[in-house]
Structures are given as C-alpha cells and as structure tokens.
Amino acid sequence: MLQYALVFFVIALIAAVFGFGGIAAGAVEIAKILFFIFLIVALVTAVMGLVRRR
C-alpha cells in the first residue's frame, strides 16, 4: 500500500514540475489540478497503509 503512495507522490511531483515550472504553458491548469489530486491520493494511500499495518 505504501508503494502506491510513493508512486502517487512521484506523479504529483512530475505534475508540479510541469505545472509550476511553466514547461507546458498550455497545460498549466491541468498540471496544477493533477498535482493536488495525486498529492491527496498519495496522502490517503499512505495513511491507509499505516493504519493497515497496525
């Protein structure tokens, strides 16, 4: 479960680089939205993984 959290976090970082760095000017808003979506999914997945281990 924590592997999924790491994957979603990496995807969020990639979306942040494209969205906040201005690399993809046409897709800035989409990349910003994807960053926050994948960041939330990564956090939820990490919490679920930690709760299941107990």
Curated annotation (Swiss-Prot):
Disulfide bonds: none annotated. It is found in: Cell membrane. It comes from the Bacteria. One of its GO terms (cellular component) is plasma membrane. The chain crosses the membrane at residues 5-25, 30-50. Its main location: membrane. It is a multi-pass membrane protein. Keywords: Cell membrane, Membrane, Transmembrane, Transmembrane helix. HAMAP family: UPF0391. NCBIfam families: PRK13682.1-1, PRK13682.1-4. Belongs to the UPF0391 family. This is UPF0391 membrane protein Reut_A0124. It comes from Cupriavidus pinatubonensis (strain JMP 134 / LMG 1197) (Cupriavidus necator (strain JMP 134)). The lineage of its organism: Bacteria, Pseudomonadati, Pseudomonadota, Betaproteobacteria, Burkholderiales.
